[in-house]
């Protein structure tokens, strides 16, 4: 264990002990957890869509007709849960989040230093990430988030009847961000599954906007990988030099997926103010879910998501002081034959390059749960192994046990690059 990790663990443990015995570093909010169910079944309730066109930003909610969805009990998606805790901003309003991120950008707050009264510790229920059925169910939700609405393609166990919030016949093919909302019978548990990247048949319907957001979040500098490429922003300054200030401004623009994901979260929170929310998603959807999870201290399970730590830092997401990475509520499931998950889908010979994607980020927040399919199955590095259906059928379902989850210390993104601030 590195000295830095040891110090972070010690500091967090010290803060936690002090919180119990005297005034404390974190304010604690303990919700009643005596009757936490061991398992719940969830079904689709809503689909949220934020259209992010160049000239306008539109938002629609589609409500699923209850009589038509999951009529058979075996079609419900089971989730096993257990008790846990979350450390997050006490005030989770949009204004408070914006204020924290602004002060972090200005150097007033940092991962190691922010006022103790900003934070609270809350007892919650979290997914049992050692339960294969639970992970498979979350994977199914992530897979379903790709499907076009109304019925199309391989949507799993979905009925034909829909109630559509105006306008009627909304075009789901336009650029934007989608979140599919699942709930249990009493709406105490809500899962938001975010749609992933539409690339090479992996997903449908939003590929152009996905490419821009992928390249902003997961490339070192606006997808500046060759003189022949059209970059997605103008932050490049010189050879292996990129403006940090410019990058941070770009990822926080209202037309970007992170901003739209906040709209989805607050909309769901308004509908279900007392519910426990979890997040999931595949690829870009998984990374977007992880960024939301970090913003609010929400349990998040992703599948084959590209490294999200670089994006989290550029967005200046809330980081409780002293909280070790492995204590955050983000788990990234993936395997070692997926170049996107590993941050190796780069270079002129890669399909990412051919599609205009620069997937260069390597480091994940939280914990990585890695299947060794290279050793166990003889797979080779290929983007074809990135598809969610492949992950469901040939990895999660095929393995008897789930992989162990752990944080990868000393990970470095974009080690050749320098990122000066504009005023430095």
From Swiss-Prot:
Effect of deleting the gene: Impairs atg8-processing.
Catalytic activity annotation: a triacylglycerol + H2O = a diacylglycerol + a fatty acid + H(+)
InterPro entries the UniProt entry points to: AB_hydrolase_fold (IPR029058), ATG15_Lipase (IPR050805), Fungal_lipase-type (IPR002921)
Residue ranges, Lumenal side: 31-424
Coarse class of the protein's main subcellular location: membrane
Transmembrane spans: 10-30
GO molecular function: lysophospholipase activity; phospholipase activity; triacylglycerol lipase activity
SUPFAM superfamilies xref list: alpha/beta-Hydrolases
Protein's recorded name: Putative lipase atg15
